Amino acid sequence: MAASMFYGRLVAVATLRNHRPRTAQRAAAQVLGSSGLFNNHGLQVQQQQQRNLSLHEYMSMELLQEAGVSVPKGYVAKSPDEAYAIAKKLGSKDVVIKAQVLAGGRGKGTFESGLKGGVKIVFSPEEAKAVSSQMIGKKLFTKQTGEKGRICNQVLVCERKYPRREYYFAITMERSFQGPVLIGSSHGGVNIEDVAAESPEAIIKEPIDIEEGIKKEQALQLAQKMGFPPNIVESAAENMVKLYSLFLKYDATMIEINPMVEDSDGAVLCMDAKINFDSNSAYRQKKIFDLQDWTQEDERDKDAAKANLNYIGLDGNIGCLVNGAGLAMATMDIIKLHGGTPANFLDVGGGATVHQVTEAFKLITSDKKVLAILVNIFGGIMRCDVIAQGIVMAVKDLEIKIPVVVRLQGTRVDDAKALIADSGLKILACDDLDEAARMVVKLSEIVTLAKQAHVDVKFQLPI
């Protein structure tokens, strides 16, 4: 029960930390759950642990354009001079400058340059240059980025459109239906989570049979229900069908268009695009995954990806190294049960090497909040002696001074215990998980007290 309770919390953290910093995936989940879609099991979508790649807006818009979806004209600029040239090329009286950062709330964010807002309307190429100079190369701080902020390396310069009406459209995966679902609303251009909470009847859902695919009739019905005028219903439906094809082609887990609009010329346009891609499809979506912007990722997240480790940083002070996502979540829950707070989720997987274990310790100890470490391994496919070798090597090479509690069970566990005992290192072995969790929590409290008193503390193994 405790593990399942933590599961939902972990997914929320994963979404914010490692994947889409924007709120699109969560928003779609809340929209689905808001009215009990599919026999009141809509909230299950929030408990799907997925690793998602996120791309910058301009990259997503390029994919839409390639798919034949109608979007405003726009180009990416990596310098103020390029922004000036693009604004001049577009030739319109006013253009929009959009900061390209993987974080939600950019419109209300603040740059370290002092500029307020990551989306600006400008009225001349000169102003485009001036505004972009305050964005490019500067960090943008939003509610999602916190104090760290996110660096803005480029801006999207696009023509300004004057919408008559704004709509919301998204495609996401719904676990309880075991397939994709289209989501639409006449309330576009606003926070869709608020719409789902305040006016759930304004949200329309259309499940799609994954084998049959989307039917033109379904898209037409959805466009009509969303309130598109009769003269552009066909155009709206065509864009929806093309977006669904894009969704399947690139193994997306979510496409969100907010807003989809009818502009002053009567054309249907997708004004913004947020797309998440399933990281499990990386082997067959090389074109997409080569676009990942590592400058937008936390350093530890980058190191974890290089070592092929599943790592998510949290706010606690007890580092965790575990094999298997389920056991990792149960380990964090039992730490919480005994009054501690986990500093991370770290799953080394079922085939970890000595090198990966060492890299895992580097990740954990690079977090200065960590005051104690709990290793919890159940050796099935994983051999406990391999883990033990990695632990011994890491403690030696990294000169780890904080307490390390190790609980090993399973394949070659006796060999593993012998390796740890023969190492002469101050590694605390424990067979019982409950006892190990209680021990690591107490040790973290001791280290906390020592730090508060500005004294050192040394640990000796029990006789």
UniProtKB/Swiss-Prot annotation:
Pathway noted in the entry: Carbohydrate metabolism; tricarboxylic acid cycle; succinate from succinyl-CoA (ligase route): step 1/1
Residues with site note (Important for substrate specificity): 94, 162
Activity regulation details: Inhibited by itaconate.
Tissues showing expression: Widely expressed. Not expressed in liver and lung.
Cofactor(s) in the UniProt record: Mg(2+)
Binding site for substrate: 323, 380-382
Gene Ontology BP annotations: succinate metabolic process; succinyl-CoA catabolic process; succinyl-CoA metabolic process; succinyl-CoA pathway; tricarboxylic acid cycle
GO MF, one annotated term: magnesium ion binding
Positions of ATP binding: 98, 105-107
Residue list for modification Phosphotyrosine: 84
Ligand binding (Mg(2+)): 258, 272
PROSITE patterns: ATP_GRASP (PS50975), SUCCINYL_COA_LIG_3 (PS01217)
Similarity field: Belongs to the succinate/malate CoA ligase beta subunit family. ATP-specific subunit beta subfamily.
Quaternary context: Heterodimer of an alpha and a beta subunit. The beta subunit determines specificity for ATP. Interacts with ALAS2.
NCBIfam families per the UniProt record, alphabetical: PRK00696.1, sucCoAbeta
Protein name as it appears in the record: Succinate--CoA ligase [ADP-forming] subunit beta, mitochondrial
Gene behind this protein: SUCLA2
